[in-house]
């Protein structure tokens, strides 16, 4: 039944988008911080968590998921589908990956260190290799490059946050750190 297929395609698309947006938003939130007071309590209203880092994290995760999905489709198919996936990847990757790059750079500029900057540089090199590879029809290298980009991007985020587990946007002294989270 065509209606059944269409409805399930819509449900799958909307839920996939929603999950990617939610996971990215939560990662953006925990990496850039919450308004935590000296007692370790979150303060502010119900929407105190809504911020630019949450938006960057959500859109960054959605964008990366789309780009990595396009690379996978281009890698695993032939013919017109492969060409369309590769062409869409090459055309849209710079735009779709911009939020995740902005998120990593925002962290590096605020709390980064030498290791986080090195990871960021390696992530940028990996994504450039991935884009050039996709442009040249080397989908396997593009997929691998995007995977390396994700790994170094995540390392950049976590090394820039260290030793914080959950930064406070009110005062850095109120942040939840590895030391006080373990006790």
Region roles according to the model:
Residues 1-5, 180-183:
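Proteins with a high burden of low-complexity, intrinsically disordered sequence enriched in S/T/G/P/A and R
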Residues 2-142, 156:
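Long, contiguous internal "core" modules enriched in hydrophobic/ aromatic residues
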Residues 144-152:
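Central hydrophobic cores of alpha-helical transmembrane segments
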Residues 161:
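C-terminal active-site-capping segments
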Residues 166-183:
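Short, membrane-exposed interhelical loops at transmembrane-helix boundaries
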């Amino acid at each position: 039944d065509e209606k059944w297929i269409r409805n399930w395609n819509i449900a799958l698309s909307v839920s996939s988008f929603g999950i990617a947006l939610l996971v990215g938003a939560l990662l953006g939130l925990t990496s850039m911080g919450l308004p935590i007071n000296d007692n370790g309590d979150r303060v502010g209203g119900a929407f105190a968590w809504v911020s630019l880092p949450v938006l960057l994290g959500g859109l960054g995760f959605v964008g990366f998921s789309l780009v990595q999905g396009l690379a996978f489709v281009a890698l695993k198919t032939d013919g017109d589908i492969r060409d369309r996936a590769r062409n869409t990847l090459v055309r849209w990757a710079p735009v779709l990956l911009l939020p995740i790059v902005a998120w990593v750079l925002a962290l590096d500029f605020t709390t980064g260190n030498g290791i986080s900057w090195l990871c960021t540089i390696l992530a940028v090199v990996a994504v450039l290799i991935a884009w050039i590879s996709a442009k040249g029809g080397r989908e396997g290298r593009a997929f691998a490059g995007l995977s390396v980009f994700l790994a170094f991007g995540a390392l950049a985020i976590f090394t820039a946050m260290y030793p914080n587990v959950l930064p406070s946007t009110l005062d850095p002294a109120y942040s939840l750190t590895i030391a006080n989270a373990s006790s």
